[in-house]
Amino acid sequence: ADGSDPAGGEFLAEGGGVR
């Protein structure tokens, strides 16, 4: 949830995170 994946579904506005 820190921005590892731009298409992640945890913090989209933060940069992604966990998918």
Curated annotation (Swiss-Prot):
Listed under GO cellular component are: extracellular region
Q: How is it modified after translation?
A: Conversion of fibrinogen to fibrin is triggered by thrombin, which cleaves fibrinopeptides A and B from alpha and beta chains, and thus exposes the N-terminal polymerization sites responsible for the formation of the soft clot. The soft clot is converted into the hard clot by factor XIIIA which catalyzes the epsilon-(gamma-glutamyl)lysine cross-linking between gamma chains (stronger) and between alpha chains (weaker) of different monomers.
Q: What are the entry keywords?
A: Adaptive immunity, Blood coagulation, Coiled coil, Disulfide bond, Hemostasis, Immunity, Innate immunity, Secreted
Q: Where does the UniProt entry say this protein principally localizes?
A: secreted
Any single GO BP term: innate immune response
Q: Which domain of life is it from?
A: Eukaryota
The subunit field of the Swiss-Prot or TrEMBL record says: Heterohexamer; disulfide linked. Contains 2 sets of 3 non-identical chains (alpha, beta and gamma). The 2 heterotrimers are in head to head conformation with the N-termini in a small central domain.
Q: What does this protein do?
A: Cleaved by the protease thrombin to yield monomers which, together with fibrinogen beta (FGB) and fibrinogen gamma (FGG), polymerize to form an insoluble fibrin matrix. Fibrin has a major function in hemostasis as one of the primary components of blood clots. In addition, functions during the early stages of wound repair to stabilize the lesion and guide cell migration during re-epithelialization. Was originally thought to be essential for platelet aggregation, based on in vitro studies using anticoagulated blood.
What is this protein called in UniProt?
Answer: Fibrinogen alpha chain
**UniProt organism field:** Alces alces alces (European moose)
